Design a protein with these regions (language model features):
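Long, contiguous binding/interaction regions
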Residues: 8-97
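Methionine residue identity
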Residues: 1-3
């Protein structure tokens, strides 16, 4: 299923209204880092900015993404990330489109 939602919008089916969202990601299993970075690269055109903070005392990394994308793309990205082992993700949306 990977990229199914992404391809729908990238291949220009129809213009969609975009939303600004912040996606918070907690990585507790570094073995998932390569796949996580691959997913983020795939959705790169929607990512406004990224901040990563390694927190060594707890052995986790916190990543915050700012995105501007259709809601289906944001949901797809968040879902793909959240299905990785040792990774959780949540999105918070702006009130306005």
């Amino acid at each position: 299923m990977r990229m199914a939602v992404f391809e729908l919008f990238v291949k220009g089916r129809q213009p969609m209204e975009t939303r600004i969202a912040a996606i918070s990601i907690i990585v507790s299993d570094r073995a998932s880092a390569e796949e996580l970075n691959s997913i983020l690269h795939t959705y790169g055109e929607y990512i406004i900015g990224r901040m990563g903070i390694p927190y060594k005392p707890k052995g986790v990394s916190v990543i915050c993404l700012a995105v501007d994308a259709p809601m289906d793309v944001i949901n797809g990205l968040t879902g793909e990330i959240g299905r990785l082992p040792g990774v959780s993700a949540k999105a918070a949306y702006s009130a306005k489109a």
